[in-house]
Amino acid sequence: MAKSRYSRKNKGKKLQRVQENTVSTEEKSVPEVETIDFNGFQIPKVYDGKLERKPMELEIKKGFVEGMNGDAKIFCNDDLFNLLTFEMIKDISNNYPSCVRQTANAATLPGVVASLAMPDAHSGYGFSIGGVVAMRLDNSEAVICPGGVGFDINCGVRLIRTNLQREDIEQHKSRLADELFKQIPSGVGTKAQIAFSPEDFDSIMTEGLEFLVKNGYAWEEDLSHCEEHGKIANADPSLVSKSAKSRGYKQVGTLGSGNHYLEVQVVDEIMDVEAAKAMGINEVGQVCIMVHCGSRGLGHQVCQDYIDLCMKSGICNPIDKQLTGVPFNSPIGQQYYSAMNCCANFAFANRGMITYRIRQAFETVLRMKPKKMDMHLVYDVCHNIAKVEEHEVDNKKVQCIVHRKGATRAFPPQHPDISEDYKEIGQPAIIGGSMGTCSYVLVGTQEGMKKSFGSTCHGAGRKMSRVKAMDNLTSKDVINRIKEMGIELRITDPKLAAEEADEAYKDVTEVVETCQAAGISKIVLRLKPLIVIKG
């Protein structure tokens, strides 16, 4: 019997996932599992013949789990595939829901035409985080799954450019970090500096970023550089519970905690000059600001409310109860879709209000108007969302409900749903790294529309749970290392810094390069942090 091998480079090193909310992250010992050689790696013998390795892809054959409607796929290079092999061994030995199994499980859902995972994918609640699952809507059984969107509905990221150079802010870095930390509340349960009335909050859930434009908190031009123009239709606040609203209405303009962040960054390298120029980014050293956050307590409560409702309905009983959903066109399906859109609109407004505060902070410290500093929005993208989109399936254009959970929409040049400013280059996809590491801007490709339903990665992706990170790293060491890099760090709870250390994540450069090699997106530029604000 062959013994399992975790890595060509790091034999025997244990890797650990992070789970969402209710899923345990307890580290367990891995009993010996009978394995076979698979392209130079060891995988469980029970998967013999059920996987196929292709360039930058792992194909999961129909039959990997019972009831699959077709093959499933994970985009990965050899090093990223190596992380998946250990998960698969734990899956067999400890009934561990690996990313591979979760991607296969999602392929059993009614109406599914694609179950994919991006290179940054890891196990999550039901769907893997990094998953893209599409169902064709001409199938009346096609489902929508709250767990397939996740608890942080429209967690997303936006990038703001400036005409400033690094030297323009270098001497102001500490004060600018302090001002941003003061202006933008961060951490668990934080409340906004501006409290909207319940009536206004309903308007925010309906209008999204438009509400901020009407009330002077956002610029008109921000709308065209935001996915869905910052407002998703079919959003009925009456379908959002009172408890969900009570968790959200005082949180417009707050960062939250966990992996959410605000970074002042500098352009480190430009790979595609023309695409960068279309985004208003013209040279290395240019200062930008990246914001990563979502729908806060509102989204979490809406997700939980509708997971509970779906489980009680008994309409859909999948292979994994965490995948429970309902037919998209059923009453409950449409209610969840509308409530989800309310949360998405809130998240657009949340990032918009944070942008308002960022512009104020820069004006306070640098004594220049935001317009003079060219503080325009490059783009704002969703990471956790389900959307109705047109895609080609079996050589026919059909309407699909596409779940993206920890994945970024990345539509190609000339796609009708992207801004006129980006028609020639494709939709920007903003990809954040782990704390203290670089981030990237990508654009979508025509090949990506065919291979990944117009989707790409969303970040680095965890390889170590929060519990494991806290056990193996000290927050003091993590903070000191970031300071030694010349980065100004402000963090609400310093004790939790180890959870977000770069060792807990995959290499974001490897992730985006895999996406490019797979043809699903193209790298435009790289940024590195000067200031990091964390919850």
UniProtKB/Swiss-Prot annotation:
Biased composition (Basic residues): 1-16
Record note on cofactor: Binds 2 manganese ions per subunit.
Binding residue positions for GMP: 259-263, 383-384, 432-435, 439, 458-461, 534
Reaction(s) catalysed (UniProt annotation): a 3'-end 3'-phospho-ribonucleotide-RNA + a 5'-end dephospho-ribonucleoside-RNA + GTP = a ribonucleotidyl-ribonucleotide-RNA + GMP + diphosphate; a 3'-end 2',3'-cyclophospho-ribonucleotide-RNA + a 5'-end dephospho-ribonucleoside-RNA + GTP + H2O = a ribonucleotidyl-ribonucleotide-RNA + GMP + diphosphate + H(+)
Binding of Mn(2+) 2, residues: 155, 292, 383
Region called Disordered, residue ranges: 1-29
Positions annotated as active site in the UniProt record: 458
Source domain of life: Eukaryota
Entry keyword Cell cycle: no
UniProt EC number: 6.5.1.8
Catalytic class of the enzyme: ligase
Molecular function as annotated in GO: GTP binding; metal ion binding; RNA ligase (ATP) activity; RNA ligase (GTP) activity
Entries under InterPro entries matching the protein: RtcB (IPR001233), RtcB-like_sf (IPR036025), RtcB_euk (IPR027513)
GO biological process: tRNA splicing, via endonucleolytic cleavage and ligation
Residues bound to Mn(2+) 1: 152, 155, 260
Gene Ontology CC, one term: nucleus
Keywords for the protein's UniProt record, in alphabetical order: GTP-binding, Ligase, Manganese, Metal-binding, Nucleotide-binding, tRNA processing
Keyword Aminoacyl-tRNA synthetase attributed: no
Pfam family, one: RtcB
Cofactor or coenzyme needed: Mn(2+)
Subunit structure: Catalytic component of the tRNA-splicing ligase complex.
Family: Belongs to the RtcB family.
Note: Ligation probably proceeds through 3 nucleotidyl transfer steps, with 2',3'-cyclic phosphate termini being hydrolyzed to 3'-P termini in a step that precedes 3'-P activation with GMP. In the first nucleotidyl transfer step, RTCB reacts with GTP to form a covalent RTCB-histidine-GMP intermediate with release of PPi; in the second step, the GMP moiety is transferred to the RNA 3'-P; in the third step, the 5'-OH from the opposite RNA strand attacks the activated 3'-P to form a 3',5'-phosphodiester bond and release GMP.
Main function: Catalytic subunit of the tRNA-splicing ligase complex that acts by directly joining spliced tRNA halves to mature-sized tRNAs by incorporating the precursor-derived splice junction phosphate into the mature tRNA as a canonical 3',5'-phosphodiester. May act as an RNA ligase with broad substrate specificity, and may function toward other RNAs.
Protein's name according to its UniProt entry: RNA-splicing ligase RtcB homolog 1
